[in-house]
Amino acid sequence: MTITPDRDVVSLEREFSDYAFEQMHPLVKVWRGDQLKTDIREATTRLVALIVDDAAGKYAETLKGLAQLPEQFKMRLIEIERYRFLAQIDFADPSASLPFVAIFGASTPPGTIADARVVRWLADKFAVFAPRRIRFYQSAHVPIEAAGTHVDQHFLAGLAREMAARPSAPGLARVILQRPTDLGFYRRYVETYNLMYLERPQIRGEVRIETEETLAACHAEGLLYEIEVDGTWAGIVAARHQVVAGARGTYMVEILLNGAARGQRLGPAVHQRLAAKVAAADSSAILTGTIAAVNVPSLKTATRAGRVEIGAWHWISV
């Protein structure tokens, strides 16, 4: 569909912001209050801009081997029967051999669309890439009705001040968070991950090592900490301020305990220490984060720490 840059873009921003607000988890509406609509509008504005800006050209340039025009990579407004979607082609691997359609906005929560033809028709709009899967986000309070879906990543959140005020987590007195002066720990961090991959090979590809650039950005925001257990280095926890799935919060980029500290149920204590620091800076802050479906230990830790599942990204095959 052709979009007229001024009038149509503003109309789409309003339309898809309304959809996102209607579909938002009730807890987020309570936590964010009047600010939520502003959060959603800012996020939606960035999405709609991808329909008309030149970012697709830059993306296409990095994937020259696919020999497709830049327009094929743009965010698209797609209408199928009574449904409207903002969707874009994406790839699950750097070689672009695993294409999928990413839904970023929808008039109806995609997981409630029981008619399998709709997702097939949506995939057909990107037929030049031959996608076999569609990925979408849906709030946890909305039941999944579409057949053949499974969770890719869980999205959990909690009000930081409430997490900090919970009864002391086991081992809390043993855990200290210290802000590092630099990223001198990075090599040790990577080594810790590589050892964990050996112990739990199923998480390789699902849980990634963060780049120095990403952790430096967390450090710049004052949200990077080294974890000490009993006075000894035991890992890191890092976060950033950002909007994810329409919810503005302090997003947990990383939480990693080394082999010596894992298995002692200290994860909730790390969460509680971080929540206290975040709440001290902003009493209205939400602590958010994604957890891969295969990372069951981290999911259990997050829920024990007081985070609740407010949504998830799902896969559906076509």
Could you describe each region identified by the protein language model?
Residues 114-124, 257, 263-280, 299-304:
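Conserved acetyl-CoA-binding loop-helix of GNAT-fold acetyltransferases
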Residues 141-154, 292-311:
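Conserved active-site alpha-helix within GNAT-family acetyltransferase domains
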Residues 2-20, 36, 87, 92-93, ...:
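Acyl-donor-binding surface of acyltransferase catalytic domains
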Residues 201-259:
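A conserved beta-strand-loop-helix scaffold within acyl/acetyltransferase catalytic domains
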Residues 1-57, 167-210:
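Short amphipathic alpha-helix that is part of the acyltransferase structural core
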Residues 317:
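Positions that flank functional sites
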Residues 29-35, 39-54, 58-88, 220-237:
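Conserved beta-hairpin
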Residues 287-291:
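Conserved hydrophobic beta-strand within the GNAT/NAT acetyltransferase core sheet
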